Amino acid sequence: MLSPRLPHLLLAGCLALGCHPRATATGASSPAPACELGPASGDHQHDFDFEFGAWTTKLSRRLRPLTGSEEWVGYEGTSVVHPLWDGKANVGELDVGGPAGRIQGLTLRLYDPSTRRWTVRFANSRDGELTPGLVGGFSEGRGEFHDQETLDGRPICVRFVFSEVTRTSFRFEQAFSADEGRTWETNWVATFARVER
């Protein structure tokens, strides 16, 4: 049974398994220009409204990203997303399991009306620390969020993409780039199906 008490996004789970790197100690610096998105236009406060509610999810995670590895592991589980502040924020809980273990993660997404951008941050049950955020938004049904972080001591760009959004389903992908965003390697793919009540 899905828990509506605790708030998700599969990325928090990715962090829990080490495929989403933590930002460096220089987290106060802004992302590299190649990792940034341009300015947003229009009101995007309700971009994530489609995700409110309970979902089942199937996801695949690439082991050892940016090493040439083609080894993937699968997970299945649930996600529950709760709206806050009339859509200006939301919090979600992800709980999935598979051969590589269990992922329990919490996502916090906050909307900044002055920039018309969202910031996505994560915590996981392993250490409870809140990560620096990826910044972005939606355009023409596609959500894209970027950040610059480090992986094994080298700077990388991180990209989240939400796509194929309908009332009852959507797709999420995470990708890393070691060349300032010229090429991307996908390392996390998840599909979501709404739990009808």
What residues fall within each predicted segment?
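N-terminal secretory signal peptides that target proteins for export/translocation
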Residues: 1-4
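Bacterial N-terminal signal peptides
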Residues: 7-18
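Hydrophobic small-molecule pocket/channel-lining residues, especially in calycin-type beta-barrels
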Residues: 20-197
